């Protein structure tokens, strides 16, 4: 089990901003899994396995959303994070997206080709 957060590299964000956006994605995914019984077993397994998280780079909004669509079609938990626009990016800018927690093999089919951030 793992969670993967994909961060856009085509927008200018500092390290702190990226860290905050990744945290938003991780929290959002966990809350979604807690409220949906079909994902609860995956969440419980992930929690007991040390909560593995992987952060990867994606080069465009189109690529990010395409991968989110693939994950959704596989029944995986997903979240798309849009920034409030108070600091470094315009309001509503999609900064990152998360997939999981879910089975490694399902997530790897979608994100396995992406480079680590």
From Swiss-Prot:
Keywords: Cytoplasm, Hydrolase. One of its GO terms (biological process) is translation. It comes from the Archaea. Its EC number is 3.1.1.29. Its main location: cytoplasm. It catalyses: an N-acyl-L-alpha-aminoacyl-tRNA + H2O = an N-acyl-L-amino acid + a tRNA + H(+). GO terms for cellular component: cytosol. It is found in: Cytoplasm. It holds the Pfam family PTH2. One of its GO terms (molecular function) is peptidyl-tRNA hydrolase activity. PANTHER family: PEPTIDYL-TRNA HYDROLASE 2, PEPTIDYL-TRNA HYDROLASE 2, MITOCHONDRIAL. The natural substrate for this enzyme may be peptidyl-tRNAs which drop off the ribosome during protein synthesis. Belongs to the PTH2 family. This is Peptidyl-tRNA hydrolase. It comes from Metallosphaera sedula (strain ATCC 51363 / DSM 5348 / JCM 9185 / NBRC 15509 / TH2). The gene is pth.
